């Protein structure tokens, strides 16, 4: 059986340079990150160039993406949250496009590496932290003190709130990483059964129908998961930003 983990290997394409003894390389992961950015750029530039009253497919897709993210921000962080639209939109589109590209056979799934998802999660975490203190000062600490909590359990609640706050980037990154990793491993495992069973002759052809059907179903599911994981990452970002925007509310 083909190794289902091999598809996640980061492979060097060429060396960029060195910092001390550390080699800086351009990898397949770097290439697919650039590809995702290029696809998003082409979509948004192509969709906004020569706009029509009756939009074409590209313009409709660009406008739909824009409005979807804008409405998500308004519903979770309020109108004031729209100042973070560039951040949330970039995260949503980058994760969704890279996830969908990764479903194509023989490509690379960027979000299958915890270092990538952790970088995105910590970007959100430090944005919330920095903006929260900039806007609210020491009042930002109010997010750790829920209103209406009886005084005798307040220290415990504050401890839990602080602990959960610093766990945010971990849960934020692991959720995306684990879902993409597990889904692609399942796809690879079922796909590897198809040629193995088909090689057994007529009986094998009939036996290969089941894994083939599973691959088709899992691929459809992965397309849905690719969107849902991007949406979950974006909406959690909005919820966290809401703490910075409206501390103590």
Swiss-Prot record:
One cellular component term (GO) for this entry is: plasma membrane
Q: Which GO terms describe its molecular function?
A: proton-transporting ATP synthase activity, rotational mechanism
Q: Which domain of life is it from?
A: Bacteria
HAMAP family noted in UniProt: ATP_synth_a_bact
Regions that span the bilayer: 30-50, 84-104, 113-133, 143-163, 196-216, 221-241
Q: Which Gene3D superfamilies match?
A: ATP synthase, F0 complex, subunit A
The similarity comment for this entry is: Belongs to the ATPase A chain family.
Q: What is this protein called?
A: ATP synthase subunit a
Specify the species. Rhodopseudomonas palustris (strain BisA53)
Q: What does this protein do?
A: Key component of the proton channel; it plays a direct role in the translocation of protons across the membrane.
Subunit-structure text? F-type ATPases have 2 components, CF(1) - the catalytic core - and CF(0) - the membrane proton channel. CF(1) has five subunits: alpha(3), beta(3), gamma(1), delta(1), epsilon(1). CF(0) has four main subunits: a, b, b' and c.
Primary residence: membrane
Q: Its membrane topology, per UniProt?
A: Multi-pass membrane protein
Which keywords accompany this UniProt record?
ATP synthesis, Cell inner membrane, Cell membrane, CF(0), Hydrogen ion transport, Ion transport, Membrane, Transmembrane, Transmembrane helix, Transport
| Coiled-coil region | none
